[in-house]
Amino acid sequence: MIWHVQNENFILDSTRIFMKAFHLLLFHGSFILPECILIFGLILLLMIDSTSDQKDIPWLYFISSTSLVMSITALLFRWKEEPMISFSGNFQTNNFNEIFQFLILLCSTLCIPLSVEYIECTEMAITEFLLFVLTATLGGMFLCGANDSITIFVAPECFSLCSYLLSGYTKRDVRSNEATTKYLLMGGASSSILVHGFSWLYGSSGGEIELQEIVNGLINTQMYNSPGISIALIFITVGIGFKLSPAPFHQWTPDVYEGSPTPVVAFLSVTSKVAASASATRIFDIPFYFSSNEWHLLLEILAILSMILGNLVAITQTSMKRMLAYSSIGQIGYVIIGIIVGDSNDGYASMITYMLFYISMNLGTFARIVSFGLRTGTDNIRDYAGLYTKDPFLALSSALCLLSLGGLPPLAGFFGKLHLFWCGWQAGLYFLVSIGLLTSVVSIYYYLKIIKLLMTGRNQEITPHVRNYRRSPLRSNNSIELSMIVCVIASTIPGISMNPIIAIAQDTLF
């Protein structure tokens, strides 16, 4: 009898929860239509995985890619609509958030074809891999639109949990297990620090959790210049710092890049930075409105350390993935310049434009690493010597992406950095921009060193890995080449049409 009563209560409670969720989706679903499309795609993947004995692999890739493309389409149709706040103030939809959501969806869409051949060769579980990628994408999108401290904490946890699982996906690889352990420990510590900072904001504002209400609460309690706000700023900066991985919060980055599966590294290297940048701009710009001088100083220190340490240490690396890890630390220093400049002098527009170019440059380089690694089994920079003699397309596309990362004209990376530095110069960040220019010159050195190895034709310098290199038939690697071609085009041609791209970003944001 007691069991029946408990069972009935459980059913009633479950029904109430379901009806409440259905009510929220019914009245707020249009605000999160792109996210709902991804959720529907996740459900489809789970249904196919649980009902089909023999997995129809092309269908799994098709459903994942289609849900991402449909989500992008839904975002584009909603472009330039009036800002909306939904779910009792927890989620905000506006042009600024949607641009970052578009960038995250673009990253995921390019990463799936980049992963196809790698998954087939390493015999990784396909469905789970795609589920984790889509769920991480969903978490990143919710983080971009988060409008309160609870959602800002929960959404990155959704992203981070999937990231931990993806980084340790090759369970038999000792390096992958080591990378996952370090990533998990650092991620857990950063989340604890972040939520501690939010608790100081919560108390100082009189119990408010919405970003704008926190500002109003600080005004009402007269706590906006209190030591508690300074403590909150330090803890939140440290917490976000571990997500963005600028120096000195970069310790996990090289090991995770080196030990994780290469398609996973490609995915994490761009999506995590886009989502964390979107969150950082909103957190610093709204709740810490009265502490702008303090957080500007903190971010300037992080940017300087990142640009110097990232680019100098990258010179000494022998692993291609570790080199890109330190390069990404330097790149986030450039992005921080745009965050500091903010709305004034088109800082956000230049930051978003540079991140768009960075996605194509970085993913194009990782596509080369995936393709070369599958055919040679090595990641050592020296082993790339003479690749042009065996695979001219791979060598040339790699060279273009690396030159664009270094910021050489007339490629997209040059114009992206130029506009970002110009906005910083107009905002009076002379020392920061000077450091950025000097470290960009340093980065060109180690990128050109790799390109020289790729293009060498001396037999004595060509390693056995390249001598035994065999190109696979087009049918087997066309998915990687598709991603690479898209990334190479996006790393070169947009630089010529820089003004229209900046104009679109400015028109959309303001």
Curated annotation (Swiss-Prot):
* Gene this chain is encoded by: ndhB1
Q: What is its EC number?
A: 7.1.1.-
> Which family does this protein fall into?
Belongs to the complex I subunit 2 family.
**Compartments where found:** Plastid, Chloroplast thylakoid membrane
Which Pfam families does this one have? Ndh2_N, Proton_antipo_M
Give the lineage: Eukaryota, Viridiplantae, Streptophyta, Embryophyta, Tracheophyta
| Residues passing through the membrane, by range | 24-44, 57-77, 99-119, 124-144, 150-170, 183-203, 229-249, 295-315, 323-343, 347-367, 395-415, 418-438, 484-504
Look up and give the organism this protein is from.
Answer: Ceratophyllum demersum (Rigid hornwort)
* Coiled-coil positions: none
A GO MF annotation of the entry reads:
quinone binding
This chain belongs to the protein called: NAD(P)H-quinone oxidoreductase subunit 2 A, chloroplastic
Q: Which GO terms describe its biological process?
A: ATP synthesis coupled electron transport; photosynthesis, light reaction
* Gene Ontology cellular-component annotations: chloroplast thylakoid membrane
Q: What does this protein do?
A: NDH shuttles electrons from NAD(P)H:plastoquinone, via FMN and iron-sulfur (Fe-S) centers, to quinones in the photosynthetic chain and possibly in a chloroplast respiratory chain. The immediate electron acceptor for the enzyme in this species is believed to be plastoquinone. Couples the redox reaction to proton translocation, and thus conserves the redox energy in a proton gradient.
User: What topology in the membrane does the UniProt record assign?
Assistant: Multi-pass membrane protein
What class does this enzyme belong to in the EC scheme? translocase
Q: How does it assemble?
A: NDH is composed of at least 16 different subunits, 5 of which are encoded in the nucleus.
